[in-house]
Structure formats: structure tokens, C-alpha cells
């Protein structure tokens, strides 16, 4: 099984890294911002940089959609996993069109409402994981 782990740097990346017991023995690659914290955490991992800031702009969406198209066609993952943020959206929608399994993990610090990214990818995910049950989509 080949795994794509996609997310913003910082807390989102930390959430994905905490899944190490799941992904450590699988073929994998990461998609995140090319920032010092990400380079440090993923120094021994295959990583593709994505465009930032994503700040929900059309420009960022188009650039990251192009990146997603290239990376997904090259790597051909079986599953795409994300905990957000916006960079996950093009990877999930293109991944769905390519027949990939999609797993979204809503960040645990959201206690009363879902993230914007969570709401955007919810309709197409194969597994949507909410860490606190107070959230209603």
C-alpha cells in the first residue's frame, strides 16, 4: 500500500506525523509547505512542496491543483490521508477522480464545528474521522 500524507506545515503536519504507527512500514510520500519545520520533521522522508500561503485564494488553489495532478500521476498512491488544511482539497478531489481512497481526520482542537476544509472534502471522503464527537456536519 502506498500512502500520500498531505497537509499544511505546523499542527496539521504534526497530526499526520502522530500516525507513524500506521505509516512507518508503508511506502509513503508527503505533500506540505517547504518550510523549516516541515523540512526538519520530514528530513528522511520523500516530500513534495506545495504552494503557500493557501489563504483560500483562487491562485493557490490553481497552483496546488497543478501540483496535485503531477504528484498523484507520478506517485500513484492507494490512499490519501489529510488533517487539512486547504492544500488537501485539490489532492482529495483529483484523488477521488483517480479512484484513490480518501481519509480525512478533523483536527482535534475543533470542538464545536468542522473546519472549512473538512466541510469541503466531507462529501467525497471514504472515511471522515472526527476526534471529538461535538462536531456536526
Predicted regions: what is each one?
Residues 79-98:
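An aromatic- and histidine-rich active-site surface loop
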Residues 26-63:
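Short, surface-exposed acidic-centric catalytic microdomains
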Residues 135-137:
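Conserved small/polar residues in nucleotide/adenosyl-binding loops
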Residues 28-34, 106, 129-131:
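Short internal beta-strands
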Residues 56-78:
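An amphipathic, basic-hydrophobic alpha-helix
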Residues 103-105, 113-129:
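A conserved, positively charged/aromatic
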Residues 94-108:
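Active-site proximal beta-strand in glycosyltransferases
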Residues 1-33, 39-42:
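N-terminal subdomain of nucleotide-sugar transferases
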